[in-house]
């Protein structure tokens, strides 16, 4: 017997000796192994500077906010399905639509662009990472912290912000909207807005300074061009919003009187907000135009039609979007109607050029309608309808009739949902093998598309008619005598179908992660054109083990189909 050891300690030593003799160490419980794996993943996410991991964090977080915003939307549509107040008070309804709009514009669509940019843009230009990796990580954590500040208003005694996502003065003041919810909204958007500005600087620096040898500006993919000009557009827009929000907080907490209505502050706020707000529409649109422009040539088996004109259209949209902000203010009577109306009509021209090029790429192409192409076509249909209604309300006489009605709600959802959500899912299905090395299931993807497409059209098409009949936006209630009940019920049914459409996608992601087969090649679609399809799926830490020669705007296609490339070159000569 060993002196000085307790019986329990002796038993432990004997078991260890048996384990050594049999060479079969004791197995760690499954739960403990899972906790260790999760812990390591959390540490890796918290400390990473890898642009791909940060991009995945952006995509996952923004999609989480998208789901939360969708839940808030379904709660609103539940209230509006029938006349009378069923579920919420007027104040609670105000909180729902305020946080819904804020999430969808500033916590979902904007960081979603940063997510796709982080993952894809360095691959497309042959860069090993972003120019400032640590700044990139800081930007993500600032976005997450700011977003949590905004939604944490629901946990305060007075509830979340309730003055609408564009927070018109004087309703945004502490007098009319007291409580910490408004302050959390204001400062949360300051933090997340600074994050977006820092990301824009990072993206511009990367595109200008870190392109691979041979990757000239006019060999860059259209997606990267759109990211460049989106980031340029962020630089004047977001600092204006940040400054306006800081002045608003000074009003609320320190009595600064910047936005007092007696001093013209109400109109000042509108000018400052919409000087940010309309460029913001294109900040969240241009990257998704780029995603669609990457997808259509691959499934048309053709190069993009009109590469240079697409770049020119992007430049024109960038500059025109900065001079149309006051078309949101026609009804104030305090803006130059002819100028802003003309500029609003004019911005439709470069957008029409893009449609011409997208359709021109498909004409006489060998089209195949895999899931990414379906989503791209859904984008074309939906965004076109939204753009047509936008041309209508660019006319001041029509805008006077339709402003602040459900026609505006329908228009903005056709433009923004039609662009961001349809192109987001197109990008997910297209680049998922590049993200993870596995293809999402095609059958589930098609179920997802058609369910969402039908749900979206059912929800928002009828809202044009509601607005034309005079139903105001942001009302929690209406009378049966108003005649809005039938269309509101249809819209609410569509909203729940829209919500249910997300379930096939979530199941598809889980099923692919658990049981999906590795694609095993650089380009699972077979006709990828840009440089990300010339590296493994998923890529290594610094993206490329070797770079192919870059002699055109389609380096991956040149690499994988040299015979076609040589034939095309001989044909051109």
Swiss-Prot record:
Its EC number is 7.1.1.9. It catalyses: 4 Fe(II)-[cytochrome c] + O2 + 8 H(+)(in) = 4 Fe(III)-[cytochrome c] + 2 H2O + 4 H(+)(out). GO terms for biological process: aerobic respiration; electron transport coupled proton transport; oxidative phosphorylation; respiratory electron transport chain. Coiled coil: none annotated. Pathway: Energy metabolism; oxidative phosphorylation. It is a multi-pass membrane protein. It holds the Pfam family COX1. Its cofactor is Cu(2+); heme. GO terms for cellular component: plasma membrane. Binds 1 copper B ion per subunit. It is found in: Cell membrane. The chain crosses the membrane at residues 53-73, 103-123, 141-161, 188-208, 227-247, 272-292, 304-324, 329-349, 373-393, 412-432, 447-467, 490-510. GO terms for molecular function: cytochrome-c oxidase activity; heme binding; metal ion binding. Heme a3 binds at residue 411. PANTHER family: CYTOCHROME C OXIDASE SUBUNIT 1 (PTHR10422:SF18). Cytochrome c oxidase is the component of the respiratory chain that catalyzes the reduction of oxygen to water. Subunits 1-3 form the functional core of the enzyme complex. CO I is the catalytic subunit of the enzyme. Electrons originating in cytochrome c are transferred via the copper A center of subunit 2 and heme A of subunit 1 to the bimetallic center formed by heme A3 and copper B. Associates with subunits II, III and IV to form cytochrome c oxidase. Belongs to the heme-copper respiratory oxidase family. This is Putative cytochrome c oxidase subunit 1-beta. It comes from Streptomyces coelicolor (strain ATCC BAA-471 / A3(2) / M145).
């Amino acid at each position: 017997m060993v002196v000085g050891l307790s019986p329990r300690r002796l038993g432990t030593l004997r078991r260890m000796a048996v384990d050594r003799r049999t060479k079969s160490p004791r197995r760690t419980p499954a739960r403990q192994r899972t906790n260790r794996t999760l812990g390591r993943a959390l540490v890796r996410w918290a400390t990473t500077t890898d642009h791909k991991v940060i991009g995945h964090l952006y995509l996952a977080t923004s999609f989480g906010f998208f789901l939360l915003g969708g839940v808030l939307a379904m709660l609103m549509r539940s209230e509006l399905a029938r006349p009378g107040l069923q579920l919420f008070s007027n104040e609670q309804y105000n909180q729902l639509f305020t946080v819904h709009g804020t999430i969808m514009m500033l916590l979902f669509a904007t960081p979603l662009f940063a997510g796709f940019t982080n993952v894809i843009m360095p691959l497309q230009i042959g860069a090993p990472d972003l120019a400032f990796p640590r700044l990139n990580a800081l930007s993500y954590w600032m976005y997450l912290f700011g977003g949590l500040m905004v939604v944490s208003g629901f946990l305060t005694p007075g509830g979340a912000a309730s003055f609408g996502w564009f927070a018109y003065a004087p309703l945004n003041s502490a007098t009319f909207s007291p409580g910490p919810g408004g302050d959390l909204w204001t400062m949360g958007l300051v933090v997340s807005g600074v994050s977006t500005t820092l990301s824009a600087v990072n993206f511009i620096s990367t595109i200008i300074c870190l392109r691979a040898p041979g990757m000239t500006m006019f060999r860059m993919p259209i997606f990267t061009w759109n990211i460049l000009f989106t980031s340029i557009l962020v630089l004047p827009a977001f600092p204006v919003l940040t400054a306006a929000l800081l002045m608003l907080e000074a009003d609320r907490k320190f009595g600064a009187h910047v936005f007092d209505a007696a001093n013209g502050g109400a109109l000042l706020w509108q000018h400052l907000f919409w000087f940010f707000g309309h460029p913001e529409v294109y900040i969240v649109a241009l990257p998704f135009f780029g995603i669609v422009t990457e997808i259509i040539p691959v499934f048309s088996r053709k190069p993009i039609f009109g590469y240079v004109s697409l770049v020119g259209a992007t430049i024109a949209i960038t500059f025109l979007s900065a001079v149309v902000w006051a078309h949101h203010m026609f009804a104030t009577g305090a803006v130059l109607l002819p100028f802003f109306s003309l500029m609003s009509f004019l911005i439709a021209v470069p957008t029409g050029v893009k449609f011409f090029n997208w359709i021109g790429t498909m004409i006489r192409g060998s089209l195949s309608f895999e899931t990414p192409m379906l989503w791209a076509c859904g984008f074309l249909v939906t965004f076109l309808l939204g753009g047509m209604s936008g041309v209508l309300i660019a006319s001041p006489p029509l805008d006077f009739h339709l402003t602040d009605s459900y026609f505006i709600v329908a228009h903005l959802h056709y433009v923004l949902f039609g662009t961001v959500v349809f192109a987001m899912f197109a990008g997910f299905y297209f680049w998922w093998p590049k993200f993870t090395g596995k293809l999402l299931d095609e059958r589930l993807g098609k179920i997802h598309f058609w369910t969402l497409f039908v749900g979206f059209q059912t929800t928002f098409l009828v809202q044009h008619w509601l607005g034309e009949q005079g139903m105001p936006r942001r009302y929690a209630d209406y009378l049966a005598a108003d005649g809005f009940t039938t269309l509101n019920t249809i819209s609410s049914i569509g909203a729940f179908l829209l919500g249910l459409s997300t379930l096939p996608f979530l199941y598809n992601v889980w099923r692919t992660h658990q049981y999906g087969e590795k694609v095993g090649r650089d380009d699972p679609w077979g006709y990828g054109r840009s440089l990300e399809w010339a590296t493994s799926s998923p890529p290594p830490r610094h993206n490329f083990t070797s770079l192919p020669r870059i002699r055109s705007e389609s380096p991956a296609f040149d690499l994988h189909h040299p015979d076609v490339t040589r034939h095309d070159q001989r044909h051109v000569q």
